[in-house]
Amino acid sequence: MEGTFVGADGRISGYDLKLTVEQPNDLVVFAHGFMGFKDWGCWNLVQDYFVKNGLSFLKYNVSHNGVTLEQPTDFADLNAFGSNSYSKEKADLRCIITQIKDELGDQIKIHLIGHSRGGGIVILMADEFKVTSVTTWAGISDIGKRFPMGAELENWKQNGSRTILNGRTHQAMPLNYTQYLDFLENQQGLDIEGSCQKLKIPVCAIHGDADTSVELKEGHQIAEWTKTSLHIIPEANHTFGATQPWNSNFLPCQLNDVCDITIQFIHETIQL
């Protein structure tokens, strides 16, 4: 089932929901990462794989990721991308969970999964919604280190915006300085370490040891702060072998392993 929700700043975004009869009261909610979207690469296959293994699964677009309802796999709205923020992504997750609980009922137990930046977001929001479990895939452990320092930061402030190159599409992706101001103004609510230490629910942390986008060290930090073990996927990059576009009907082996670990973890959590 495809649907829409009203996210941060009233922006309408899309989601995909597939329900199972095996676990009617448990729902996986998946948050994508930076320069990602719900239909990126293998995420549709991931959703199908979870459903095949008895878990209802929802994936959604954060409201300011740059894609649109009309062009859900293209960065067609760079103004929205430039004005995104971590606080907006928190608001998006809040909006989609609230809407889904209204539609499916308050008895629904939420299991959050977040990839990369989405991993940080699901940790930050887990306590607010008293979710049942959290899983991070190559999750970030520190938001502050995502921003430039020194002269680069000062130039960003003076110019009001800077750009980064999207290596896949070759687009110059704008980042407004307001993103950094949002971080400065909301640091307490964007403290991943502090949020990890508050969690009293099962946490599963997974990371590839060949990840060059988010260091393996960040996975170790999440595991340490949540008092769990880190699942390390040998020779796996940031996306566990997935690419955009993905033209196969099968998951890459490493991402398949990630899914198997996560599915087992969630089923074990349901039995607690």
Specify the residue positions occupied by each region the protein language model found:
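Catalytic active-site module of serine/aspartate enzymes centered on a nucleophile-bearing elbow/loop
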Residues: A236, F240, Q244-L272
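Alpha/beta-hydrolase active-site loop
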Residues: N79-D102
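Short beta-strand/loop motif that positions the catalytic acidic residue
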Residues: K198-L199, A205-H207, D211
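Active-site nucleophile elbow and catalytic-triad environment of alpha/beta-hydrolase enzymes
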Residues: N176-S195
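Hydrolase active-site cap/lid region
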Residues: E128-N176
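Short, surface-exposed "cap/lid" segments of acyl-processing enzymes
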Residues: E22-G66
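Short alpha-helix in the alpha/beta-hydrolase fold that links the catalytic acid
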Residues: W43, I201, V214-E224, P245
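N-terminal cap/lid segment of alpha/beta-hydrolase-fold proteins
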Residues: M1-Q23
